[in-house]
Amino acid sequence: QCGRIWVCNGDSRLRSHRLSIIFGFARSYFMADTQYPAEVVAFLQELLPNKKQFELYMALGFYKHGKTEFYRNYKDHVEATNDLFALAPGIKGLVMTVFHLPSYGVVFKVIKDEFAESKKITREHVKDRYRLVKTSDRVGRMADTHEYVNFTFPLDRFDDELLTYLKETCAGSIEIRENKLIIKHLYIERRMTPLNLYLRDETDEEKIRHAIDELGLCIKQIALTNIFPGDMLHKNFGITKHGRVIFYDYDEICFMDERNFREIPKSDDPYALDTLSVAPNDVFPEQFEHFIVGKKHLKDCLKELHGDLMTPEYWRQLQAVCKEGKTINFTPYNPTKSFFYEPGKKKIAYL
């Protein structure tokens, strides 16, 4: 007999873009136990025609095969196109050199040989932070990364600016052999619109407000998985085509209990802060408003929607939740789409 799987699609209309988020690149893998992964992927592609095979294999937990499928897809795409690899849009990173192929939906990230003076970290520390994210619950808020060694590119597909910049910043990680450029170690992530560029170019106030709300939710949800994001400048976040804000800069992340959230001492002395004793793990949330977003109207919006982020008490409450080992369930979909939805019955908030 032929088995059938029924998907309820009533008056509320289940849409593919909402289903897509469940299998999204910012969520942890399902680790599906199936003898027929190819058939499962084929079924899911009928529901999600915009998802590539490698994305679905990875979402199901077949990570290594997903990497193989990605490389095949990448090679086929490069052979079928003629655009050039170029530096990715946005502010250049202090730790990574990031580039992309405009016609392809990923970015390539290479650890620089030397970091900016403000970054007191090592190459191994960066790798360790990326491994931490890989093994953590990403709750739909941290982009998945795919680590490759000796990844090959066609040399003639690099524009001059990118090739020069790679030689300047990542000489120890690249090798040129005849007509190929080999990168000894790199990470690949899904390409998103950097949040700072989105907020700069967007004119719709409602969309701007939604993005700022998403930014606050993103920070809070990551913290509830026992990870402190560290560098929370809005340039380190991206926004997807579905309007979700995702974090993608991991070199300064740490566990929540590794930080001491403090108040700024109240004083009439304008020089009091200059003499304040600060330990390396001290964090002052009251200062977050000065660097998460820059422009005043964006700061005001963030404080209105997520003002608790700027208080030490809130962060200490999150630390207590993490210490108790509580598991918080963040559904990636509106509760009205749940099979168990009962109108009028309060559910976990849609986050």
Say what each PLM segment does.
Residues 36, 194-199, 255, 279, ...:
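Short, solvent-exposed coil/turn linker segments
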Residues 204-235:
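Conserved kinase catalytic-core helix
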